[in-house]
Amino acid sequence: MLDAMREKPPLVHCITNYVAMNIAANVLLASGASPAMVHAPEEAGEFAGIASALTVNIGTLSTQWIDGMQAAAKAAASAGKPWVLDPVAHYATTFRRQAVADLLALKPTIIRGNASEIIALAGGESRGQGVDSRDPVEQAEDSARRLAERQQAIVAVTGAVDFVTDGERAVRIKGGSVLMPEVTALGCSLTCLIGAFAATAPEDLFGATVAALATFAVAGEDAALGAAGPGSFAWRFLDALAALDGEALDARARVSLA
């Protein structure tokens, strides 16, 4: 799937936060996709109809941004394009909770979050603090299954060991590095990469989500080998993504049934 994406680079419409825009665009470029950071409500809906996939991250919200997100999500859904929701710290404020509730009503095809975000989104009590998860992934697995069934969507919980489910099937993905949480917006970038894989294989959104997470996990392992800390890890991670190919990914991905 990685090789197929590079052979025909998808245009991924990323509505993401200010912190993440640069690294998310570079992650997509290194992986072989084409990023577009378009969030103005005056054009977001039109652009979503052009793009191969849409990703929506609520990290830096405003009323205008929400208008753009909703316009894009409606257009993507109407055009049958996959779209990914990243409900960053949605539990933190009333404004965020309402924004996410409205976006969920527009039926995202994939939802990606940390454990605290997914637990809260499914109706449970999480221990999240701001954008940081205080809950381990394994405690969010049942919540992810319930959320996937309720939303009829793929749900990915990312952390030390990732978890992906469609409500029936479920897998865990091992790999990555302890340095990954020390580089801001890598998780936001992963949401964009999920969109790229979903655009490449819209007929297999479960497999596309797993492939994106496995790509991040293997690249994270490679980047950590020579990294002295988060600074050198960040650029090594981009290099690792660019160097990874489908054969190496298939050989090294650690995916198991859950």
From Swiss-Prot:
Pfam families from the UniProt entry: HK (PF02110)
Residue sites binding substrate per the record: M37, A185
Catalysis performed (reactions): 5-(2-hydroxyethyl)-4-methylthiazole + ATP = 4-methyl-5-(2-phosphooxyethyl)-thiazole + ADP + H(+)
Requisite cofactors: Mg(2+)
Binding residues for ATP: R112, T158
Entry keyword set: ATP-binding, Kinase, Magnesium, Metal-binding, Nucleotide-binding, Plasmid, Thiamine biosynthesis, Transferase
GO MF terms held by the record: ATP binding; hydroxyethylthiazole kinase activity; magnesium ion binding
Pathway listed: Cofactor biosynthesis; thiamine diphosphate biosynthesis; 4-methyl-5-(2-phosphoethyl)-thiazole from 5-(2-hydroxyethyl)-4-methylthiazole: step 1/1
Annotated GO biological process: thiamine biosynthetic process; thiamine diphosphate biosynthetic process
EC number: 2.7.1.50
Record's function text: Catalyzes the phosphorylation of the hydroxyl group of 4-methyl-5-beta-hydroxyethylthiazole (THZ).
Family: Belongs to the Thz kinase family.
NCBIfam families linked: PRK09355.1, thiM
HAMAP family cross-referenced by the UniProt entry: Thz_kinase
Protein name: Hydroxyethylthiazole kinase
Organism: Rhizobium etli (strain ATCC 51251 / DSM 11541 / JCM 21823 / NBRC 15573 / CFN 42)
